[in-house]
């Protein structure tokens, strides 16, 4: 995994990869499903969608590092922000999404892709939530595309 850090640092001319947690880096590099990555890219390109991070990873990684992770799969250009880390709705990530939307009233269409916080997202964002149980599969992609095209 140390070799992976060196390889990515050289490939992207970015020494930040040398300081990244090697297990997180390996998870992004090896474990992200290529088909799911392509589906996410397709959503971004087809619908001119942007990615706003609400992942728990933002709790210990700044946005610049998250972009570096996404860069490995050429998705960094779609990352435009992150939700605030303010706990509302009983410490739910859905509350953070609500705050982000309140702070960005120009957003008229959005989809939430998540593998957790199901109860809260289904309660507060039933029309925008796509539960990705394991990866962004074809059925979940179709649901997300339908939401973004409505």
Annotate each language-model stretch with its function.
Residues 64-150:
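C-terminal cap/substrate-recognition subdomain and adjoining C-terminal extension
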Residues 1-87:
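Alpha-helical substrate-recognition element adjacent to the catalytic core
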């Amino acid at each position: 995994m140390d070799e992976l850090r060196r390889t990515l640092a050289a490939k992207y001319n970015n020494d930040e990869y040398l300081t990244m947690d090697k297990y997180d880096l390996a998870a992004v590099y090896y474990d992200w499903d290529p088909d799911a990555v392509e589906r996410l890219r397709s959503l971004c390109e087809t619908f001119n969608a942007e990615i706003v991070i609400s992942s728990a990873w933002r709790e210990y990684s700044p946005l610049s590092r998250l972009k570096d992770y996404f860069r490995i799969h050429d998705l960094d250009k779609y990352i435009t922000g992150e939700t605030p880390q303010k706990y509302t709705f009983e410490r739910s990530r859905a509350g953070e999404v609500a705050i982000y939307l309140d702070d960005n009233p120009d957003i008229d269409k959005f989809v939430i892709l998540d593998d957790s916080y199901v109860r809260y997202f289904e309660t507060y964002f039933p029309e925008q939530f796509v539960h990705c149980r394991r990866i962004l599969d074809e059925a979940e992609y179709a649901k997300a595309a339908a939401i973004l095209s409505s």
